[in-house]
Amino acid sequence: MSLVETDWLDQNLNDVKIIDCSWHMPQTKRVGFEEYKKVHIPNAIFFDLDKNSKKNTSLPHMLVEKADWEEIVSKMGIKNDDKIIIYDNSDVISSCRCWFNFIYFGHNSEMVHVLNGGLKKWIKEKRKITCLLYTSPSPRDTR
């Protein structure tokens, strides 16, 4: 897994797809999407780990089928040749799970990275944040 530093992302905000994949254990009473709506890195797209996992299983967060994955990333406006930076604001390292999903489904491992330190480090360094929700462009071909 490749990490990128906050300095690098700050200089390349408009050249990459940024994904907030914050997920919290249920007992914490924290909800990743609710936190995303209040604060996130500019241009970040929220990836809902619960919503984007297989539904017809008793096990949590199982991978969806390839066709379902392609629909998910297409709706997010992501193509196979996009450089992707994934981060989270959680203690369970959900960004790594999201990274795994992209690699498992064939996205080039040199194009998918995790932000070192996540949102906590980004905010601690007083970098630009927003509450504006990302609006996905029309779905694209993800193949």
Each language-model region and where it sits:
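Positively charged, proline/Ser/Thr-rich regional signature most characteristic
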Residues: 2-81
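Structural signal for conserved beta-strand scaffold positions within catalytic alpha/beta enzyme cores
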Residues: 20, 46-48, 86, 114, ...
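Catalytic cysteine-centered active loop of the rhodanese-like fold, especially the PTP/DSP P-loop
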Residues: 61-116
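Long, charge-dense
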Residues: 118-122
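Conserved active-site segments centered on acidic
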Residues: 125-129
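Single conserved hydrophobic/aromatic residue that forms the stacking wall/gate
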Residues: 134-143
